[in-house]
Amino acid sequence: MIELGLHTDNWRPLSMSFEASCAKIAAVGIKHLEFAAIHGQNFIQALGYDPGISLQANPLALRRYLDKKGLKVSQIDGSYPMMGPNGSAFGVQYVTQTIRFAAELGCPMVDTVDGAFETPGM
């Protein structure tokens, strides 16, 4: 059975927090969500204006929070331009940490991107 899920980034233009995004998703009866992983800390997210989650957050506490709302994480957005000039320096570590976080959270998938531009010869 195919089930619909939403990315918390849908509420980014409204400067909503992760918690506010989860409340909106749960309110319409959707059970699955995706969120962006933040590698480190983000000032805007700490103020409650970004619906992403820091990879330094406690995944078990996050899982308990989502369980109470009846939500499951279907995928974590660990997007970094892997084929860009900093892909090997930063992207690999970022995605590796996102995979670890997903495993601790019980999330089955992580996504990333190759980059914004076509790499010559690829």
Where are these regions (language model features)?
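Active-site groove signature of glycoside hydrolases
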Residues: 102-122
